[in-house]
Regions:
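Conserved NAD+-utilizing ADP-ribose enzyme module
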Residues: 1-179
Length: 179
């Protein structure tokens, strides 16, 4: 049970949990590391809030896109988490600069906020660079809310200042469904 893993070839006494970026590749190699494999797709939030911290807690490493021989890349899970955060933030910033706007969801009482999964006492403002992503979240408790387009200069000058005063976080390109 759990994630597929192999013994680390670089760090004695440590296991490497195998993760793939492509479902077809994972399915192709799953039978060589497990007797009854099941492919599980993790969201970015699950990876950052649960999977990678759990691997770190159990002193396991991350092996990326294993193709049957020696695990070429073995990463510390928290280092990998930080790399994921930086890559996602970079992509978000590039998209926002291109659109010159940020999209949020708001109702009659202000912006939609969520509980942070990485900082339990914090609230997060989910926002998107792509309006289609924001509109796709208008279901469940958010179905009566509106997608709001905020010019980038206003988002930086006003919205980020408001979030800072309130002690709230920003959730760029939030991907885990409706509120």
């Amino acid at each position: 049970q759990g994630l597929a893993r192999r013994e680390s070839r670089r760090m004695r006494g440590r296991d490497v949990c195998l993760l793939w970026s492509d479902e077809a590749t994972a399915a192709r190699w799953a039978h060589s590391v497990a007797s009854n494999p099941r492919i599980k797709d993790f969201s970015l939030t699950e990876m950052l809030a649960s999977v990678l911290p759990g691997l770190a807690q159990h002193r396991r490493l991350v092996g990326l896109d294993w193709l049957g021989d020696e695990v070429i890349v073995e990463l510390d899970p928290m280092d990998f988490a930080e790399r994921l955060r930086i890559a996602c933030l970079d992509a978000f910033v590039r998209s926002v600069e291109k659109m010159d706007a940020v999209f949020t969801i708001e109702g009659p009482y202000g912006p939609a906020l969520l509980r942070s999964q990485t900082k339990p006492e914090g609230l997060v403002l989910p926002c998107w660079a792509n309006p289609g992503e924001a509109y796709s979240r208008l279901e469940g408790p958010w179905r009566e809310m509106l997608v709001i387009k905020t010019p980038l200069s206003d988002f930086i000058g006003e919205r980020l200042a408001w979030l800072s005063r309130k002690g709230h976080l920003v959730g760029p390109d939030y991907q885990d469904g409706p509120g």
